[in-house]
Each structure stands twice: as structure tokens, then as C-alpha cells.
């Protein structure tokens, strides 16, 4: 296997879909105590989501509670309750190029700005003839880590607290 020219630093987010966001809020916000830190709404992505935080500082994990704007349209963010996971990447453009060269299939849209303000792209849940490597049923979001996240994970890896 080739030497990987980038690092997966940690989990950036978990996205949970449901037909009714209020039911998700009951558990995640009201009972588990996650804080709603923002919202994101996109006709193109057929999503209305609350962006919540689990933990603090640069190592916090984003938990997105999502419902479709129109349950009859795609993408159907509620059809798979665990919609996707997001991974912090230290150098997203390098990662995308290298993974593409290794046969990884990406979802349409390329690198773009995500709902939380970071550059993102998605590994497709299924491989294809041209790009045989996919997420084996899981949509995986690759997220460009900001400098403070890269520094925090580097310090953690080096045993610095």
C-alpha cells in the first residue's frame, strides 16, 4: 500500500436523520444535553438540520440532527437514520487526490463549503466500475480540519496535554 500523504485526525461529526427533527431534539438536546450551536437549511441537499456540539474546544464532535425538507425528494436524509460520519482531515485536497488515485469513488459535488463552514466532500457509499472503493454502505464526509484542530490532534499524538 502506498504511503498516505495526509492524516485522518478524528471524528468531526455524526449526522442523524429522521422524519421529524423535534423527535431527535427530544433525545439529543433535551435529554442528553447537547447544545444547538447553529442551523443549516438547503433546498439542493433537501435538508433542515440543527448543528449540535458534544464536548468542547477543538476536539468537540458535531452532531447534526436532520430532517428532509420534502420527504418525497432525494437526497432522503431521513431514510438512513445514521446518515453519515465526518472525519477531520489535515489536508483535504491532497487526501481527495490520493484517494481518487487509489480508486475511491466520491459523491458528486467535489470539494465545497459545508453547513458548518468547513470545506468538505463525500466518499460515496458504493463503489463503481471506474472507482471500485466506496464506503460499503456508509456515506463518509471528509472535512478540512482548521489549524486549531490539527494542532490539538498533533499535541495529543505527541503526548502533550
Model-derived features with residue positions:
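Vicinal oxygen chelate
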Residues: 2-5, 10-19, 50-55, 73-161
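Alpha-helix termination/capping residues and helix-transition junctions
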Residues: 8, 31-33, 79, 136
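Conserved short beta-strand elements that form part of the metal-binding/catalytic scaffold
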Residues: 35-76, 116-146
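N-terminal beta-strand motif that seeds the catalytic metal site of vicinal oxygen chelate
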Residues: 1-25, 82-89, 143-161
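A short, N-terminal "cap"/entry segment at the start of jelly-roll beta-barrel domains
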Residues: 2, 29-30, 41
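Residue-level detector of anion-binding/catalytic polar loops
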Residues: 35, 88, 105
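Amphipathic alpha-helical segments
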Residues: 20-35, 95-102
Amino acid at each position: 500500500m502506498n504511503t498516505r500523504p495526509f492524516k485522518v485526525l478524528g471524528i468531526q461529526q455524526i449526522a442523524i436523520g429522521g422524519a421529524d427533527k423535534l423527535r431527535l431534539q427530544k433525545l439529543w438536546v433535551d435529554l442528553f444535553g447537547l447544545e444547538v450551536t447553529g442551523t443549516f437549511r438547503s433546498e439542493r441537499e433537501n435538508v433542515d438540520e440543527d448543528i449540535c456540539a458534544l464536548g468542547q474546544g477543538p476536539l468537540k464532535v458535531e452532531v447534526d440532527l436532520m430532517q428532509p425538507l420534502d420527504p418525497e425528494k432525494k437526497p432522503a436524509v431521513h431514510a438512513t437514520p445514521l446518515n453519515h460520519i465526518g472525519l477531520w482531515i489535515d489536508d483535504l485536497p491532497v487526501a481527495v487526490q490520493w484517494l481518487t488515485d487509489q480508486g475511491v469513488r466520491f459523491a458528486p459535488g467535489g470539494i465545497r463549503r459545508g453547513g458548518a463552514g468547513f470545506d468538505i466532500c463525500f466518499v460515496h457509499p458504493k463503489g463503481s466500475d471506474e472507482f471500485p472503493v466506496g464506503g460499503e454502505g456508509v456515506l463518509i464526509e471528509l472535512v478540512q480540519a482548521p489549524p486549531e484542530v490539527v494542532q490539538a490532534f498533533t499535541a495529543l499524538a505527541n503526548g502533550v496535554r
